């Protein structure tokens, strides 16, 4: 086992900045500031890994250092399997993680292959080497809670208490996103080290293991109308039950535990983290049974909060499905966050635009933020987000920024970053990518594609087409994964990264990729009949052959 740290500076060890960018982002994924369990190559999300094992990691490293600028490395579930001569505008790396034939696409078969060293779970950005820590999900979480506030609480979360659980790589964004919307958050996690990490990075304000203290702090902050986030150490089922018994009013209930993986991601009721680890190794079958039973209780308690007046929503971890499979027949009585709050953004091709400064110099991000403000002065949501991000976001690993941008905006910003690198206003190349959670890159019936207007929730073609078009457009590294976010059998999704190194070649590739990628989001929603998407496609001149057959009749 090695200790990996994000590499910074202007000298490179690969044969070009593009290959260097891949290597640096791989290292960044495993920097102790970023990864949850770097010693096990685990980045986030249960067992979301950056490489299959240390031997494969070192082979990836070596291959990247030797890779020519007209070659492409193929990575199969975290292991480099081939290098082929392609051309300079082709991707340097193509990645496929944990993709199983549908009949075998379940955790039992995956775990069997995993034990044999034949596969790896890549989550979304763990195995595609573009994770930037909790900031990567903060703006999406912020936008979700902002929209919830608009719909249910007169535009703001001031004077409300949100109860949630899970403070891992994804869930760790919740406390900050809620306080950014002026709400109070009680965030439960059984693993104290996760609470500590969120306190250290200033995503969470205070820590306690005492429920009464947490409720007192929450009530006081609520009465003052101030934002406050409380990391409460404990088991979610126990805590939720106790809060219901005390009759404490919860305004919003959700969950971001790693319920997508009942073996490695969720700790059953009645077990400490250490006890769970022992049982997991000794009797995995029993562990999964206990874990799923706890999840069923967990959802029943969420439904009870909903019955008592709380706004309830699923935050994309598949906990409703597990509960439904274990006898909770009304598990889907509360909606997922995408149909409830995010889909209108997807219809316009709006979604994640994240970038990292390969130099390691925070000044490069400051200059990029300044440029974003100049380019989009009319985008009030974006400007408000940048103000909050600059004030409250701590960098993990390489300095980075996340911003939600739409069709046309992404290409405009990408080209601007390339120009700033070319002119020396930014000191080294910038990596531009996104989460796989985006407008046109995912098929996930319990999350991103839940309740599609035309019933096409489970159609996986769109995620495949996204990977194909971004490869054709010349992304720097392109990935296709299975099971991210919601677990085996429940999702297919694609990722893209493109490097702005200041060159004319990069300019061509950036313009293509940052147009095709959000364009897929618009096309996917046009095909499903969403009028906002149809209007966007017509306004932006996106060529969709059968557009006149789409939409409401």
UniProtKB/Swiss-Prot annotation:
PROSITE patterns: UROCANASE (PS01233)
Highest taxon above the source species: Bacteria
GO biological process: L-histidine catabolic process to glutamate and formamide; L-histidine catabolic process to glutamate and formate
InterPro entries: Urocanase, Urocanase-like, Urocanase_C, Urocanase_central_sf, Urocanase_CS, Urocanase_N, Urocanase_Rossmann-like, Urocanase_sf
Keyword line: Cytoplasm, Histidine metabolism, Lyase, NAD
Cofactor note: Binds 1 NAD(+) per subunit.
EC number(s) per entry: 4.2.1.49
Cellular localization per UniProt: Cytoplasm
Annotated positions binding NAD(+): 45-46, 123, 169-171, 189, 194, 235-236, 256-260, 266-267, 315, 485
Pathway the protein acts in: Amino-acid degradation; L-histidine degradation into L-glutamate; N-formimidoyl-L-glutamate from L-histidine: step 2/3
UniProt key word NAD: yes
Pfam families for the chain: Urocanase, Urocanase_C, Urocanase_N
Record has Heme as a keyword: no
Location, primary (coarse class): cytoplasm
Cofactor dependence: NAD(+)
Catalytic activity from the UniProt record: 4-imidazolone-5-propanoate = trans-urocanate + H2O
Disulphide bond pairs: none
Family the UniProt entry places it in: Belongs to the urocanase family.
Name this polypeptide is given: Urocanate hydratase
């Amino acid at each position: 086992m090695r200790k990996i740290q994000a590499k910074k500076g202007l000298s490179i060890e690969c044969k070009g900045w593009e290959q260097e960018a891949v290597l640096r982002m791989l290292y960044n994924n495993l920097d102790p500031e970023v990864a949850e369990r770097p010693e096990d190559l685990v980045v986030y999300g249960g067992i979301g890994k950056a490489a299959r094992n240390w031997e494969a990691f070192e082979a990836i490293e070596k291959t990247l250092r030797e890779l020519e600028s007209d070659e492409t490395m193929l990575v199969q579930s975290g292991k480099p399997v081939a290098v082929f001569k392609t051309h300079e505008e082709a991707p340097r790396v193509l990645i496929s993680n944990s993709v199983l034939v549908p009949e075998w696409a379940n955790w039992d078969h995956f775990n069997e292959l995993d034990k044999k060293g034949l596969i790896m779970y890549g989550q979304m950005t763990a195995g595609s080497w573009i994770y930037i820590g909790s900031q990567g999900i903060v703006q999406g979480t912020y936008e979700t809670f902002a929209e919830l506030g608009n719909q249910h609480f007169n535009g703001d979360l001031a004077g409300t208490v949100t109860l949630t659980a899970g403070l891992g790589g994804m869930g760790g964004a919740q406390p900050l996103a809620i306080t950014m919307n002026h709400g109070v958050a009680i965030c439960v996690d059984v693993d104290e080290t996760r609470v500590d990490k969120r306190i250290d990075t200033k995503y969470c304000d205070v820590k306690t293991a005492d429920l009464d203290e947490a409720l007192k702090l929450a009530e006081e902050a609520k009465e003052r109308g101030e934002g406050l986030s409380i990391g409460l150490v404990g088991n979610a089922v126990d805590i939720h039950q106790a809060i219901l018994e005390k009759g404490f009013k919860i305004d919003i209930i959700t969950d971001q535990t790693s319920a997508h993986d009942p073996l490695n991601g969720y700790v059953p009721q009645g077990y400490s983290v250490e006890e769970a680890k022992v049982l997991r190794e000794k009797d995995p079958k029993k562990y999964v049974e206990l874990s799923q039973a706890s999840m069923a209780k967990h959802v029943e308690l969420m439904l009870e909060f909903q019955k008592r007046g709380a706004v309830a929503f699923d935050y994309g971890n598949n906990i409703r499905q597990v509960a439904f499979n274990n006898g909770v027949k009304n598990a889907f009585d509360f909606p997922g966050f995408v149909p409830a709050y995010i889909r209108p953004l997807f219809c316009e091709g709006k979604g994640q635009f994240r970038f990292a400064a390969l130099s390691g110099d925070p000044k490069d991000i400051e200059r990029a933020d300044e440029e974003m403000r100049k380019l989009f002065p009319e985008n009030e949501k974006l400007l408000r987000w940048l103000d909050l991000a600059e004030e409250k976001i701590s960098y993990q690993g390489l300095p980075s920024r996340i911003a939600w941008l739409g069709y046309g905006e992404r290409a405009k910003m990408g080209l601007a970053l390339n120009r700033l690198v070319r002119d020396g206003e930014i000191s080294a190349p910038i990596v531009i990518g996104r989460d796989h959670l985006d407008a046109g890159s995912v098929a996930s019936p319990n999350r991103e594609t839940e309740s599609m207007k035309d019933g096409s929730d489970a159609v996986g073609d769109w995620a495949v087409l996204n990977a194909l078009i971004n490869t054709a457009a010349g992304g720097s590294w392109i990935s296709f994964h299975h099971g991210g976010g919601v677990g085996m059998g429940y999702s297919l999704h694609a990722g893209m990264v493109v490097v702005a190194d200041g060159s004319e070649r990069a300019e061509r590739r950036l313009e293509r990729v940052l147009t095709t990628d959000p364009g897929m989001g618009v096309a996917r929603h046009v095909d499903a009949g969403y009028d906002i998407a149809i209007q966007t496609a017509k306004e932006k001149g996106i060529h969709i052959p059968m557009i006149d057959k789409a939409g409401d009749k």
